[in-house]
Design a protein with these regions (language model features):
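Extended, highly charged
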Residues: 14-175, 179-181, 185, 214
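N-terminal-proximal low-complexity accessory segments that begin disordered
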Residues: 1-2
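Flexible, glycine/threonine-enriched loop-and-boundary segments that flank and lead into catalytic domains
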Residues: 183-193
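Extended, hydrophobic alpha-helical segments in both membrane/secreted and soluble proteins
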Residues: 178, 200-209
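Short, well-ordered loop/turn elements at secondary-structure boundaries
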Residues: 6, 171-174, 193-196, 200-203
Length: 214
């Protein structure tokens, strides 16, 4: 038996939205982003299978519009496809895109936009699973926020910056970085299970409140 150690580690970075990078990259598509704090970015793990991916994207866009917000556009997240990975990691590697969401007329503050993005994320995720797509389970939102963005995966800590080319770009500037690496001991690792999640990082030992009061 040979241990595939490279598929037992999940790593990630949570940083502030790199506004300059995103603004300049979206401008190449003819998209002018609103001021920082008036748009949100979703980091979306999508199925590689085209039909399922398209259905996921369309359902997410539908939810954004139903919630009164604006779909500004999509961006393919540049990754190093030549980065050495084990077959297990490559087999589960998602297609990664970002959706840019502008605030609607009913949203007056960044806090209100954050709450609306939460509703969009949860509503769309449930709606997509209700479609019973062949690869619908591969849809996952790593983050959706007007303040922060999460770059994560089934990667070693020293691979995150190499895999996600945005993290090598000098336009990526952040006053904070929440970095995490976890060796999986009691759960099977996966791209979507890498920490940090959208607000925190932990080692999987958050137990029920009853365990702390009994």
């Amino acid at each position: 038996y040979q241990c595939d150690w490279s598929s037992d580690v999940c790593s990630s970075d949570l940083i502030q939205i790199p506004d300059t990078l995103y603004r300049e990259e979206m401008a190449k598509q003819g998209v002018t982003l609103p001021p920082l704090g008036e748009y949100g970015v979703g980091m979306i793990f999508l199925p590689k299978e085209h039909a399922s991916r398209l259905a996921c994207e369309q359902e997410l866009e539908r939810t954004v519009r139903l919630e009164g917000q604006v779909v500004l556009g999509w961006r393919d997240v540049p990754v190093d496809v030549k980065l050495p990975m084990s077959p297990t990691v490559q087999m589960t590697e998602p297609f990664i895109r970002q959706i840019f969401i502008g605030r609607g007329r009913d949203i007056m503050t960044t806090d209100a936009l954050e709450r609306k993005l939460y509703v969009i994320r949860k509503t769309a995720s449930h709606a997509i699973q209700d479609l019973h797509l062949k690869h619908g389970k591969e849809y996952f939102v790593a983050s959706m926020s007007a303040r922060t963005i999460v770059y994560k995966g089934l990667l070693l800590a020293n691979q995150v910056g190499a895999y996600y080319q945005d993290l090598q770009d000098p336009r990526t500037v952040s006053a904070l970085a929440l970095v995490h690496q976890r060796f999986s001991t009691n759960t099977f690792p996966a791209w979507e299970l890498a920490h940090p999640y959208r607000m925190i990082a932990h080692n999987g030992e958050i137990n029920r409140s009853e365990e702390h009061t009994s």
